[in-house]
């Protein structure tokens, strides 16, 4: 903020100089009012004076004020008093001329007297010494000692009063054209001056008596000097008006600068808030990536569990082979005697009960798994709602940031408009300065040309005035150069501000674009999660229906086996009680062996089907766990195995349970045996297909591709980091 402090210091210096110039102008005007008493003797010159006042009053504003500012830099205290008393003095200017205007002019009865050379010398001495007096009063006592009082003093006093009224009337006209002027200090002192101005007519009487021939030329020179002094007075008044307007304008610019500073600070605070919000959003994105990594670790754990399940399946297949060997041994024992058949049937019943118990346990575990799956679904729903709330909050923040950017753009437009207006004012100021300089140069040339016709004393006075005018011209040029430098500095600072605002707007646009991209990604992930949830719900319903169907089929088959076991028991009891012949016994034995073979095949098919159902239940459990633990993994439950298993069961039903009580011997038994062997082969093929389904291959390929994509995204994506601090800090 060093540039702002420098600018404030320069503005303060400029205001001090303006006040000093106004004070000195007022002081000069008070001292020069005494010597304008003889303007009434020359009405043509007075009319020309007023005309030139209106013509040159607006042109000599800026340059004369700058010269007076530089010439009198040490009168700040008097400037303060002059600025405070503006209102009361302007009222005096408006009322006092009307009082004097009501009095009749006695200039028509007054006979103009000629002054002597000592009086002219006193006048020049007074003009040279009037700039050093602090109060603007003329020491007229010296003139009283030199010039005796004549009887014509009342007429002189009246002429002085009329000249003062005409001068003040001209000043009042200038004040009405530009209100707010600070140069009206001469009004309260007019009532004190008639006693002092009485010395001027006495001096004029001596001049008329001493040198009547030289008086006409001297009076012409004095009238020219009065005209020039009146022009300078008018210029001083117009310059004071301009200084007042410049003071007001500087105050307004200071207020605008304070407002702009407050706006910049507010914008910096808003920018820091937006940076904090972006950091929070990035932290949320990092949390989501960590959650994805956790899901990947859970998938790896599920893979390990799948391998363990495969190992358990292999152990169960080994147990199945052991059971098959045991079954073959039981069959051999059953051939040895009918007593062993009852024992084998009992063991089969026990195994069926064990199978029922295992089925119940599996059902209970399935229910527990279902409850866990429902809890996880509820948790996913809660997470989805939280994500939706976060998305809405991000959209709201985006709209707020967009509004702030629009407001900043409007402020930039306003600053540009103010810059254009300042440039236009500077151009106008340059044009006015050039016109004033041209008018001054013309005046200097005219004074040079007229100096050859004047006397020695008038040439010295005009040369002094020329030197002063040249000095004023040089000082005004220096002031213009200073103002140009300040203008260039302000223009560069404004360009820097515009560049900074443009860069900040671009950064805000980039941040908004990043937020929009993040919101779009979150929306897509939300839609994917919703679709995955719906698919998992459908698969869960399919699984429930499938388990219900398998339960019903197993219960019906268990009832059928119990009925067959009861029939076998009845046959065994009937065998002991019957007294049939040997042929009947042989035929019955043959039928029993065939039925035993059929029952064995049925038991084998049931055991294989039971194993397949157990494997299917385990696979469904794994799929449900994987779906609940990793909803984004995109795993799908394959229902082809269930359909194939159901088709196999439907195909086994007519073969195994059709006409079990009639025509067990003969060709029918052979055909039935062949059908059972074919059915057994088809069941084994189904088990092989269940162990190696094509859906599992697709699932494995999909999981591998998903993990590969996640790793590529995590390794290649690099979030944008802002290392710079916010502007508010």
From Swiss-Prot:
Residues 134-146 have a biased composition (Basic and acidic residues). Disulfide bonds: none annotated. It comes from Mus musculus (Mouse). Residues 215-629 form a coiled coil. One of its GO terms (biological process) is Golgi vesicle transport. Gene3D superfamilies: 1.20.1170.10. Residues 718-729 are lumenal. Residues 2-696 are cytoplasmic. Highly phosphorylated during mitosis. Phosphorylation is barely detectable during interphase. It is found in: Golgi apparatus membrane. Involved in maintaining Golgi structure. Stimulates the formation of Golgi stacks and ribbons. Involved in intra-Golgi retrograde transport. GO terms for molecular function: protein homodimerization activity; small GTPase binding. This is Golgin subfamily A member 5.
């Amino acid at each position: 903020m060093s540039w702002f402090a420098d600018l404030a210091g320069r503005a303060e210096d400029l205001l001090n100089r303006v006040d000093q110039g106004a004070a000195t102008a007022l002081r000069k005007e008070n001292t020069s009012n005494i010597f304008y008493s003889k303007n009434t003797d020359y009405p043509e010159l007075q009319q020309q004076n007023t005309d030139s006042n209106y013509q040159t009053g607006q042109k000599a504003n800026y340059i004369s004020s700058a010269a007076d500012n530089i010439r009198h830099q040490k009168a700040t205290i008097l400037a303060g008093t002059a600025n405070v008393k503006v209102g009361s003095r302007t009222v005096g200017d408006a009322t006092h001329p009307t009082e004097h205007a009501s009095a009749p002019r006695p200039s028509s009865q007054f006979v103009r007297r000629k002054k002597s050379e000592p009086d002219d010398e006193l006048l020049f001495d007074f003009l040279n010494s009037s700039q050093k007096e602090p109060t603007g009063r003329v020491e007229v006592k010296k003139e009283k000692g030199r010039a005796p009082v004549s009887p014509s003093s009342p007429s002189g006093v009246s002429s002085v009063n009329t000249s003062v009224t005409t001068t003040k009337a001209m000043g009042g006209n200038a004040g009405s054209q530009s209100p707010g002027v600070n140069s009206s200090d001469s009004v309260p002192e007019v009532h004190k001056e008639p006693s002092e101005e009485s010395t001027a007519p006495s001096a004029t009487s001596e001049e008329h008596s001493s040198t009547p021939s030289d008086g006409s030329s001297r009076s012409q020179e004095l009238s020219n000097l009065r005209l020039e002094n009146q022009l300078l007075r008018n210029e001083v008044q117009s310059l004071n008006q301009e200084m007042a307007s410049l003071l007001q304008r500087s105050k307004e610019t200071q207020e605008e600068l304070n407002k702009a500073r407050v706006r910049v600070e507010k914008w910096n605070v808003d920018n820091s808030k937006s940076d904090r919000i972006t950091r929070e959003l990035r932290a949320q994105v990092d949390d989501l990536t960590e959650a994805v990594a956790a899901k990947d670790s859970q998938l790896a754990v599920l893979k390990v569990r799948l391998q363990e399940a495969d190992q358990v399946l292999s152990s169960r297949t080994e147990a199945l082979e052991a059971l098959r060997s045991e079954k073959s041994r039981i069959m051999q024992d059953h051939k040895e005697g009918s007593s062993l058949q009852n024992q084998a049937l009992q063991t089969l019943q026990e195994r069926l009960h064990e199978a029922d118990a295992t089925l119940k346990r599996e059902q209970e575990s399935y229910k527990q798994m279902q409850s866990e799956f429902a809890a996880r679904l509820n948790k996913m729903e809660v997470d989805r709602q939280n994500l939706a709330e976060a998305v809405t909050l991000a959209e709201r923040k985006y709209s707020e940031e967009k509004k702030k950017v629009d407001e900043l753009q409007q402020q930039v437009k306003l600053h540009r408009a103010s810059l254009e207006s300042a440039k236009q004012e500077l151009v106008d100021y340059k044009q006015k300065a050039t016109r004033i300089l041209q008018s001054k140069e013309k005046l200097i040339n005219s004074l040079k040309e007229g100096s050859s016709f004047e006397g020695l004393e008038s040439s010295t006075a005009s040369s002094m005035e020329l030197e002063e005018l040249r000095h004023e011209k040089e000082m005004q040029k220096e002031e213009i150069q200073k103002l140009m430098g300040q203008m260039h500095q302000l223009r560069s600072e404004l360009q820097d501000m515009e560049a900074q605002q443009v860069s900040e707007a671009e950064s805000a646009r980039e941040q908004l674009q990043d937020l929009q991209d993040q919101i779009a990604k979150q929306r897509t992930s939300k839609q994917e999660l919703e679709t995955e949830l719906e698919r998992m719900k459908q698969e869960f319903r399919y699984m429930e229906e499938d388990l219900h169907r398998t339960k019903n089929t197993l219960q019906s088959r268990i009832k059928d086996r119990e009925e067959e076991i009861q029939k076998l028991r009845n046959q065994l009891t009937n065998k002991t009680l019957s007294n049939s012949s040997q042929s009947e016994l042989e035929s019955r034995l043959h039928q029993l062996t065939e039925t035993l073979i059929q029952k064995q095949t049925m038991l084998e098919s049931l055991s294989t089907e039971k194993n397949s159902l157990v494997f299917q239940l385990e696979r469904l459990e794994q799929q449900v766990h994987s779906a609940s633990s990793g909803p984004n993994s995109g795993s799908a439950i394959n229902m082809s195995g269930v359909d194939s298993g159901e088709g196999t069961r439907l195909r086994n039903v007519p073969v195994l349970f059709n006409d079990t009580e009639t025509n067990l011997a003969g060709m029918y038994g052979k055909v039935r045996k062949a059908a059972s062997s074919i059915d057994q082969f088809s069941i084994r093929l189904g088990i092989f297909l269940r162990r190696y389904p094509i859906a599992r291959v697709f699932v494995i390929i999909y999981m591998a591709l998903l993990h590969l994509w996640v790793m590529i995204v995590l390794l290649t994506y690099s979030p944008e980091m802002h290392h710079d601090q916010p502007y508010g800090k």
